């Protein structure tokens, strides 16, 4: 059997070959087991590393949690301790306050009781003193009167001895009593001071919590208590010597009073003893010692600490006994000897006894016998015995009295004092107990609260402690929960470690210190489990293979044993793996809750941190809010300070204003004095009156010129001092001339060959007006009246000189004034004739027969009137009242005053008629001053300081005005001043106005503005202030300034002040500055592009539109808005857009333009987010562009005898791209070359501004005077002028301002123009074709024949036609007059429906001589063409499609009309049957119209979604190219149509070039008005009570307001104007003209 046993290597020794495979298998298995063991070891090492990592993490978390818990606990503990300390400190302070209050209350009680006891003692003492004095008096009387010395038989020696003896006895008693009383008082004071100090020490020791006061009571007081009392025996005091002089008994009574008061103190001190043995006060002299001894014994038995002792009395007590008790002084000195006392006088002797000598007290002379001495001795002994008995009796009575009066009260006082002392003692004890309890409470609160304590402070501490504990528990709940979770995790880890350590592999680690305490990772366990399962499967496969191989080979028993052993090992390994798998699963299940708990703890921790962060943020926000509140409070305080300073400044300004008012009052008084002085000097002027008349008659100067020279300054001076007017019909009397008189004068002027109208520029005046034309009497009076009529409402316009009077133009003529001045040298011109009239009757012009009484003056009998000139043809004078009013005066109501009576008849209120009587030198200075002021004022009024326009001729004219006219005016003013004329006539009131006038702002944009003014002197610079800050200084001669960098939409205040040199500031110049306010525009719209050019493209049918883009800033903005692109418009219609802010060109195709057209204009607008800009300067499309497309060419004058046709008049216009070359160069080649000069003349007339308010008569002589060589330069100047006008019109931002310049109303120019137009063969590119739709007409032949007959008659009657005008021109002029008469006849039937508009319709030949260049009735055609009268409503516009496009059907394109007035057919229709087919519309409503007018002058229209007929006379057509945006009709060329403007007040709509000119339904020739800017001269309140119901629709004015006026003045003297966004009627006589344009 031993041989068969297997070898250790698994092979048989006999059969090594057979055992080798089994050995190899075993070796493989062994290697695999070792490999498995190595893997297990590696896994265990990984597990141990994971355990260490988790342990470190757990330790770190535990440490962090512990650290946080400690920090939180420390923070909470510190907060709790701080709060507890604050509470304790508050409790201590409260208890301290209570204790101090109780002590103060106790002291007050004690002081009150002391005061009461002291008062009582004072009263008792006073009673005792009185009793003692009475007893002493009685004793002295009894001793003196009843003694032996008073007997008749007694000798003088015995009497003297008796008195001496008596005095000795009294002095001895007094000394004994005083010494005893002083000792007692000192003792009682020392005892009281000791008790007081002890009481204070006790209070400080027990109630303030401080140690007791160190030291002992006052040593003097203690010593005074310990020293023995002085002896009370009589032997201790030496008797006084008899040789001393004796005092009177009065001093004795005083000493007794002092002793009694001291005794009162002793009794009060003794009454405080606890036993109360002392019941009475000493009532006699011999009872002092026993009472004081008893008091001393009772005082010695008192305790040293007593709370019921008396405090020292107040220091203000005046009595000696009530003074404050101080430490005991040194013992009292011995009393003075008895000789110091005075004798008490008896009642009978009175005061006389005091003066008795003291001989009675001297010893008797030594001459008596022995018996007599014995007898005397016996008598003295007997008297002494009687006196002793009497003293004893008195002593007993005193005792009885004291015992009867005081004992009960003293006992009661003692009892009360004892009770109070007991109460004070108990209160002190309670206070000490309370302090001790507080100390114990503090100690318990610091250490630990003791339960069961009933003290209030302890309860509060407990409540606070519980609250803090609750807060701490709530705040620490999170850390505690986290600690619990960490502890649970730790326990679970311990359990897991124990389970791992108890496994089968624990024996491998026994040598390393016991079981492992590491953490197992669940993932690692899962991975290990899967790997173990794979190993088991692999081993099972190997075993199966081994079993299969073992069946093939027959093995021995050793092989089966080896297999069994391996099988057993495998099973053991499988069991171990299953056990490990179960453990891993258990660990995984336990680790999941632990992980969840850890995550929850982390979540709670994060929540706590977030809460802490939120609290910190809240705290920061509250802190910031607190800081902000503090800052606001600081700002408020600062604002209050500023407000206070502003109030102070306001008060100072008020004081300064009062001072200035006082100065002004003084200046006014001085001025009144100066006005009174010249009146006194009138008597000195009479001798020189004839010399003045001689000067007036001197030839060489027309008499009207000086008057007119000073007339305009006077109007301005009066305009500044007129009172406030209210709108009544009577108030307009000062502004309107007589209408009938003016019509007659105008009619006469129409037939006069003299040209009164002046052209728009100064060179034309100097060249065209003949120098030798005389002025007739009627002409001079007419010019005076016309200028007088417009004086109140207007002043000459500075830039254009449009409204200069005829006399002012004569001043500019070199032949009339300047040449005369040059030839005459310094000779003064003749002065006008001044006459003074007196009113004989009362006269009210409104009650007279005249139709227009506004221009006449109301007269009162006795009034003085200053008359200028001669009487006119109607019997009226031009006069002025003494209050400054001017007007017409009827000659039959006044009577002239002879010259001899003038110095004595002038009223006190009349103007100054002579110089003031001043000392030598001052009168000359005053006269020179007035002449200077009048000269400067005249220069301003005559337009001498106007802004110079471009052109050499204008500069020459200005130089002429500056150099020559000043000399003329100076001489005139000197002459008038010497004559004694009034200062209003001289144009000044004695104070020169140096301030610049007529401040005007123009070109106001969002960021800039231009201001112009008329300076009073061109020799001084001006300072420009913006918002009361100096902005710029303009040099002398400059009257404009441009502001840059302004803020959009901001209100500014501009002030212009003249800066005078130092030497001129010494004179009072009056106002030196003028102020105007304005608002800058809001940002936008952008500026339009520049230099628009239209050119043909290389491709046919294509145009290239190029422009210069607007200037934009870095942000791409123009005028404050963002630029987005450009829009191209052709005749007001948008054709394309370019979405590029920097684009400069685009391409237009032929299909984009409106066809057919003879020509078009292209404009470009800048697009932005806020809308589009205004139109740029339009560019004309090349003419050959349309020719290449074969446009149907229409002759310029066409007529068709069929249906109502369209008449078109071609006249030249000035496009903005017009070059400086003569207009003839632009004309078509079909025009003859001779047309250049007439076209230049026509352009000159076309560019002209609206005519002046002077005369409706045209200047016929101005035509043809200019040579043809100057046509080009004139056209150039006019083109520049029109360019400036265009800019100014664009600046006004009003749709009514965008209008072409009206054609001049000069008939010669119009006829000349029409003549040349008739000769043209084709339309020129610079002409506009206008058409007028006409109604029913006469036959051409009949009309022509009738007109020719009328024209021949008029041609024969008129002989003033200039020879240079041709026959056709005369024919056209006469034809114009005939047309006007026929139109007046045709308009008669239309006035029935316009009667409520009649008040606003101007009369023919109105004072404003403005007219349209295109006649309202009908346009002229060729001489052979038929003439048609025009209907009431006309449309002058450019045809869009030619005549062939106009139709009468509904398919015709709709046109837009605007209603000129309200219309209700049921009320206003002439045909009530057809009223149902008519439409109702309102004024300013837009209507859509199809076709043309029918035979009844009606249109087919749509209004309010209803279709019907509308009367053509009440509507006017707008341009075709309108489009509706935002539910409003909008015109592309001018923006939105006016929604507020009253169109009937405009006398026609003004529309830009290329669009239709809309006129009103009036057949007469009405002017096309340009809005004017005027300034209010006075205040005006239409809502005044005097107005009644007439003030509705009128504007309220303030002096200096700038008003935009539309249209002419109506019959009632009103303009239609706009102020501050409101529109209404404005009285014309309260407005003055302002300069609208300036360069």
UniProtKB/Swiss-Prot annotation:
Residues 1392-1406 have a biased composition (Basic and acidic residues). One of its GO terms (cellular component) is cytoplasm. Belongs to the RIMBP family. It is found in: Cytoplasm, Cytoskeleton. Its main location: cytoplasm. PROSITE patterns: FN3, SH3. This is RIMS-binding protein 3B. The keyword ATP-binding does not apply. Residues 995-1083, 1088-1184 form the Fibronectin type-III domain. Interacts with LRGUK (via guanylate kinase-like domain). Interacts (via C-terminus) with HOOK1 (via coiled-coil region). The keyword Repeat applies.
